[in-house]
Amino acid sequence: MATALPPRLQPVRGNETLREHYQYVGKLAGRLKEASEGSTLTTVLFLVICSFIVLENLMVLIAIWKNNKFHNRMYFFIGNLALCDLLAGIAYKVNILMSGKKTFSLSPTVWFLREGSMFVALGASTCSLLAIAIERHLTMIKMRPYDANKRHRVFLLIGMCWLIAFTLGALPILGWNCLHNLPDCSTILPLYSKKYIAFCISIFTAILVTIVILYARIYFLVKSSSRKVANHNNSERSMALLRTVVIVVSVFIACWSPLFILFLIDVACRVQACPILFKAQWFIVLAVLNSAMNPVIYTLASKEMRRAFFRLVCNCLVRGRGARASPIQPALDPSRSKSSSSNNSSHSPKVKEDLPHTAPSSCIMDKNAALQNGIFCN
């Protein structure tokens, strides 16, 4: 049984239910200790990583939205996956800001919302990868190029992804928890039932196995098919997208598998019997880093996405630089302007004769502005 805490570690205020569960699994004392300098730096680093995740996935969404080439089914799924990663970054950032001593100022409902948002992001990401695999498989079987006008299947699959994700994330707050059954409580998530965690891991594992089977079938279809695609460029682009998605799935499995295994250990272990469960934050960080790696994979593996991504970054930089360095034209003296205008009018025919091939005014501009507007002058 858990030992009583010394008076200096007793919380002054907080929720009794949360304290009871955290004390039962052995995590109460650690949450109430003052944060050391090293843990504070780690927290700041995690917050910076989360901000970077949100920023880069937001840029992926903007790049897909602004580029008409990406308005097809495949990139809609990639955009949905970027939205899931963005949500994961926000959810983990909120989780960090509400952790530590602040945990015990939360009600069980707010605690379930805090942790459930992470499960929603995980469920949406996993289901999005499954939806991409299903779409690719159906396309390869029919051997037809993407039809931008037929998007009902895309939105149906994306809608199903979010429905499943929100359902999984809402189950604990709807009653599948261990509020009245302490021996069934998870060590990593003290208010979650071990049965619920085992159920979620089973669902996610089944989805990942299905994804691997679908991509293996797609690979063998491509290798064994004797049918030729009429447009070589479309075929090459399709295979490039396939390679990109396979890399995304592989990285997802590599990043999330350690956390899945840790949850299985949590389900199997007796309370306070497995010290590794108290180091779960590092496994969670590895899983969250997957959301930061996906945009990097898009830009490195897809030439079109790389161009759109870097064009967006360059436009933002040039626009910001132009806003900071906008020149202010000095006012002209009226008398000088009159004399100069009269001189120009008297010599204007000569100038026109001497310079018949003068470049148009649109080309006489700052180089950065020209690049921004897409104007190239000879």
Curated annotation (Swiss-Prot):
It is found in: Cell membrane. Residues 1-40, 102-115, 180-195, 266-281 are extracellular. The gene is S1PR3. Pfam families: 7tm_1 (PF00001). PANTHER family: G-PROTEIN COUPLED RECEPTOR (PTHR22750). CDD domains: 7tmA_S1PR3_Edg3 (cd15345). The lineage of its organism: Eukaryota, Metazoa, Chordata, Craniata, Vertebrata. The keyword RNA-binding does not apply. It is a multi-pass membrane protein. Residues 327-357 are annotated as: Disordered. Keywords: Cell membrane, G-protein coupled receptor, Glycoprotein, Membrane, Phosphoprotein, Receptor, Transducer, Transmembrane, Transmembrane helix. GO terms for molecular function: G protein-coupled receptor activity; integrin binding; lipid binding; sphingosine-1-phosphate receptor activity. Belongs to the G-protein coupled receptor 1 family. It comes from the Eukaryota. InterPro entries: EDG3_rcpt, GPCR_Rhodpsn, GPCR_Rhodpsn_7TM, S1P_rcpt. Residues 337-348 have a biased composition (Low complexity). Residues 66-72, 135-153, 217-243, 303-378 are cytoplasmic. Receptor for the lysosphingolipid sphingosine 1-phosphate (S1P). S1P is a bioactive lysophospholipid that elicits diverse physiological effect on most types of cells and tissues. When expressed in rat HTC4 hepatoma cells, is capable of mediating S1P-induced cell proliferation and suppression of apoptosis. This is Sphingosine 1-phosphate receptor 3. GO terms for biological process: adenylate cyclase-activating G protein-coupled receptor signaling pathway; adenylate cyclase-inhibiting G protein-coupled receptor signaling pathway; anatomical structure morphogenesis; G protein-coupled receptor signaling pathway; inflammatory response; negative regulation of establishment of endothelial barrier; Notch signaling pathway; positive regulation of cell population proliferation. Disulfide bonds: none annotated. The modification Phosphoserine is found at residue 326. Expressed in all tissues, but most abundantly in heart, placenta, kidney, and liver. One of its GO terms (cellular component) is plasma membrane.
